Structures are given as structure tokens and as C-alpha cells.
Amino acid sequence: MTIFMRLTPLPAFLIAMTWLAPGFAQVPEAPQTAGAPAASEQTPPDVLQLQGRTLRTYEVPEANQGVAAGLTHFFAVDNATLAKYEIKSGRLVDRWSGAPNGPIRHMNSCMVDTGRIRCANSNYPQTPMGSSIEEFDPVSLEHVSSYSFGMRDEGSLTWFDRYRTGWITAFSHYDKNGGVPFKDHSFSSVVTFDQQWRRTGGWLLPESALERMAPYASSGGAIGPDGWLYLLGHDRPELYVVGRPTMGPVLVHIATIAIEAEGQAFSWAKNGQRVIYTIDRRKHLVRTIEIPPVVVKDASVRRFR
């Protein structure tokens, strides 16, 4: 005997629920944004291991925090002291010194820029952290102007450089002396500003570089002639090279360069060569070091210039 059953059509909402049930969901593939890397290209590139070459060494008693290079002179930085040396002869030309424990008490770094020596100053190791930019005349070493950040949640200003039409900077936190108990060195970051020092963006430091800087953070930094950002920690003889991510808030670590220097502020030569001026703070030396090319072909990382 054959049995016939009458099938009643399912209501439309039940059909919709069937398609949306687990195992039946039909999710269209997200369109690829023009210029964005494919998923396979979003994995960070391998970190290159490179070696710098020392070219020249200067004996500089003031080489304690860093050095800034001009065309004919370099300027050694030591907290509240700025010393001017002739590049060709290594001769001391002049020295500026602030009052002990005065308003300029901890210059972390300086840069020679548009007829000025611009220096990152902080109240380290005092807390709350306060920072300012102090400017000097490169000829007379006379102090000419000051810009105060006051207290910022980002931490203590350690270095800054030109970036697009504004600035790129580092604000640091510390695990020990000079830090605060609720923020360790991992809260350090790179921050961008416009010409009037209004914040425009920023990034976290990559863990692979940050762990090498602990318990401090980035004490020196500058964009190189190749457009990558180069960073020095507090004491390791290593230069960390990072790029901008195409997505996300963390810088991309692309290379580590072994150099004969132990951290802190450095400066690129003004002649456009791949040479940096850096210091050995324990021996009170300034060294010029040739930096090898950093070649990275990866769609997930971009240069700063």
C-alpha cells in the first residue's frame, strides 16, 4: 500500500533560521581592500641580524647621555651639560652647563635642526614625570627657548625627530628608579605630533625589541636616510630597526644591528651617509659607526619616509 503525505511549505522565517543555523551559515568572503596585504602577508617578517662597523672614536668626558651631530661639529649630552666638539679635529670648542638640580636636570637626547640644537629634557628620576624641549644656539650654546609638555600619561620624553610636517617622539616608562608602580617599561610608546605639538597618533613598541630594553625603554631614536626608524635602548650594544605596520597599533621589528655602543641617544650624520654618532657611556667615548643597508620586501611593513 502506498501512503501519500502532503508537505506544507515552511514559513519564510524558518527557512531563514535554517540558513543561519550553525554549520549552515553562508558568510560572504570579505572584499580585499585595495593596497592592503593578503592574510598570508600579515605575518611579521623575520628579524634580520646585522653588524655595524666602527669608523672613528673620540674621547669625550661629557659622553654620558648621548650625542647630536651637525655638519662640522657634534654635541655631547650629559644631563645638564652640552659640549661642542669639532668633528675634524675632535677638539672641545665650548661647553654649556646648567645649575645642579635646576630646571634642566636630565637632557636625554638632542638633535641639530634648522639652526637650533633641540633637546629632550625630563625631571628623571622624579615623579610625577615631567618633560620639556630645550633649545640652544649651535654657535654660542646660549639657551634660547623652551617648550614644556608638563605631565603626560605617556611617560618621560626621551627623544624626538622630524616626521612629515610634525614630530615623532618616544615617551618612556621604567620598571625601577624614575618609574611609577602601576606602569612598567611595557607602557613606553612612540607618539606622533603635528608642528604645534598636538598628538596625531602613535604605536606600541614591538615586544621583541622591548624585552631587550628592559627595565628601561627606548633612550635614543631617529629616522634613517632609508626611511626606517632606528632605536637604541639604555645599555645593550644593539640598534633596533622598526617600520610602520599596515594595520594594528604595534611597530614591526625588522632588524637588529650589533654596534660598538651601549645605548642611549645617537644621531645620523648630516651628510646623508649611513653613519651614526653614538656613545660609550662607561668609557666616555663618542664613536662614528657605519650602518649596513636594511633590505626588507614585505607588504606588512612600511617606511616612515
Question: Can you annotate each of these PLM segments?
Answer:
Residues A69-L71, V112-T114, R162-T165, I223-D226, ...:
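Residue-level detector of Asp-centered blade-edge/turn motifs that repeat once per structural unit
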Residues P37-P61:
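A short helix->beta-strand "capping" segment at the edge of beta-propeller domains
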Residues R91-P128:
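Blade-loop segments of beta-propeller domains
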Residues G130-S140, D184-W197, V241-R244, I291-V294:
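Beta-propeller blade signature
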Residues L55-P61, S97-G102, Y147-D153, W203-A214, ...:
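Surface loop/turn motifs at the tips and blade-to-blade linkers of beta-strand repeat domains
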Residues T54-A80, H106-N108:
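Beta-strand-rich domains and repeat architectures in extracellular enzymes and scaffolds
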